Amino acid sequence: MSWQVGTIGNLATLQRGYDLPDSAREPGPFPVVGAAGPNGFHSEARTAGPGVTVGRSGGSIGKVTFVSEDFWPHNTCLFVTDFKGNDPRFVAYLLGTLNLAQLNSGAAQPSLNRNFVYGVRIRSGLY
């Protein structure tokens, strides 16, 4: 394996999570994962596990969570929609080693824009 310089955009594709007000939650087995990690359950999953989320708003901006099962990614996080052939656990580990909070693009409310994340340079044996 040779290590290459690339970007997060080479490693994975991110998408903003889905809205789910507390009033719309229905009891169920699927974790709802937000900026700070799991924050409840719902009757429906929006994406298959394993998955990786990154906190995109508030005090948990940049927090990385690995999710082993199907789940609902909440709108307070970004989630990986395409691992581009890379191992999800390694992607979670690598993202967790980066200081993604430094990419804050918000003013009063911290916010993480996936387009800024894509350009972060990394060195990896993946891609």
Locations of the language-model features?
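Non-catalytic DNA-recognition/assembly elements of restriction-modification systems
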Residues: 1-34, 123-127
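A short beta-sheet element
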Residues: 34-96, 100-101, 105-118
